């Protein structure tokens, strides 16, 4: 509904490496309600993830699917948004425990030569059902991505100036 969110609440890393970047709602009107704000936040985060992912694509990565995990992955709406933004099949990692900590332990075990991280991960976790992207929504999100990227560039100086104001008060 004409609402875009830049999710840079604590700065941004890849691809901008900009600690001064800040969150911005573009297009906000009195007609937007809670549901539109929440969806804009979800879409903004998904677009930022795709923006970072694009760096890997530029370096030659071409994944067959996207695998997500964690809190956001439990939301069917967020899975749908991520799938449509990325334009690739999506699956959710189905595993118990703290997935980040377990992943770090698997990598550490591989680094020490104790185990093969890929084999250990396959025995520990499985993937949920495959979700395929909707081509129409993917095209819409690609247009939104262009606006999203342009909005960051247009506001980059504003972020710096706001930081200056904050440091003076």
Descriptions of predicted regions:
Residues 1-169:
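Glycine/Thr-rich phosphate-binding loops that ligate phosphate moieties of nucleotide
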